[in-house]
Amino acid sequence: MKIQEFNVGPRFIFGEDAISELSNLSIKKAYIVCDPYMAKSGMVHHVLDHLDQGTVETKIFSGVVPNPTVESISKSISEIRAFKPDTIIALGGGSALDSSKAIILTYTSLEKVSKPTLIAIPTTSGSGSEITSFAVISDLLTEEKYALVDDSLVPDIAILDTVFTMTVPPAVTADSGMDVLTHCLEAYVADGASDFSDACAEKAIVLAWENLPLAYKDGNNKVAREKMHNASSLAGISFNNAGLGICHSLSHAIGAFFHSPHGRINTVLLPYVIAFNSSLSHPTVTPTGSRYAKVASMLQFDFQNEKEGVEKLISGIKQLSAQFGIKGTLDDLGIDKSDFIKHIPEMAERALADACTPANPRKVTKSDLESIYYSLARSI
């Protein structure tokens, strides 16, 4: 048996009005990173209201963009170097959290200073970035996505408060929620999976499966929102330790070229990846297929054998995503079929080199990845 480690990550503060705990933290200079909506909508004031304006100096950077870029990150660097914060507060979805991580890594490298305290306040339930040592940054010039992986990127404190998720639109709720499920299912079968990561993934799968439809139908359902927030962090703990797989690798490459929502891309790819990892076209499934069948059993699907269990899980995922208007085709991603096919060889090359690929349970070739892309292109 190989030697493994398991890291839980940040200090978690969660529950109703968890944001109020900000006032009890030792903060002198806070650099708040968010997108323009968080600033214009007043959502950022939920943070400012709990920072003692008499003793805490604050500065807001609201230049976060979806799928953060090298260019957007660079806009903050001169500002943060002059401000010299002792705390960085990341307020937003995965893009804000990933931006904050890239900012903090760049800032500490340039200034040769100790890392400021990083406080993550997620406003969507999906990326799990509030727990992980990962960040994904795009380069618009090269049309590539880069995965940053460093233990210093794990936030010091994560504040989970549903007040920030109540106004998230249904489509974003669905996309980010399906990203949670993708994280769970990839971590559950990843090479680095363990009893510890499995426990987090299993709980998160059940929470997301039960509560995502409820949060989608009624954004004011506080219980469903809270459970999805918890599921997202549990999934993050799981994949931060176990790893991910080719669903994310394939997704990163598509996102780099076509800029579709990350969670939506994962949603349409996931059934194909499960089938591939299980060798579903063969008479019997792989050991990985047995793991997927265990998930199907957890979700109370009826089946006679493991192959049927995998098929039921795939069918269940398609039915779940259909509730959110996601049919599982390129149309869901707003991508032209001929344009997609033209980019398949290069996307497969990038996916093969992606940081998520090594943890996939079934080892892949470029041809394997191209085959999955072509299967998606043929879907109607």
Task: Give residue spans per PLM region.
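C-terminal and late-domain segments of enzyme folds
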Residues: A174-L234, S238
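A short, small-residue-rich loop immediately preceding and capping a beta-strand
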Residues: I80-T123
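Short glycine/serine/threonine-rich phosphate/pyrophosphate-binding segments
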Residues: E16, L22, K40-M43, V70-I73, ...
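ATP/NTP phosphate-donor binding region
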Residues: M1-T87, L330-D331
